[in-house]
């Protein structure tokens, strides 16, 4: 009876946390936005303290100008910081924070490709992917703890089954959602850059360059939190042809 009541409680909590993303996908999000935004703010402040901030006026102006265009229709103000880091990377955090590595600025061929990167990262924020990811992690960890406490598997078979549940939670629940989030951010990013006046077809060139930069060294896609670059390129080509 207790097990049934707990499962009903878990089920009702899951239903109340369901929302819809900007692309129409159902999401599981139950953490308060204020809490997630504070986490993003704290993380960004830490990065600014620990990483060297670029003084290159050209880099800063380019990143700021493109970011401003991408988020022009979004509410609130956005902070953009260029970090001295040779790795080709960029990110956006809850609380409207955007970070761009100098390595990304040297990799892209033009402002449209940089707009594709920033649009993608802003897409993560608009779709509340950080909240979704944190909610998933919390739900899985709490749910597994409750199931373990209720079931109390003592046999070797029971322990093995629970171990498999852990593997399933790792690669069957959490990992795939990350790939879905990345693909969704791609879709949102292309829409943002197109609305801002940039050429969305340049997103294809961007990921071709990213694939060349990776020199073919990628994890197997099934165990990766990001789609393979070749998969991304195919998706962009399909979206840009519509």
What does each model-found stretch correspond to?
Residues 1-2:
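N-terminal secretory signal peptides that target proteins for export/translocation
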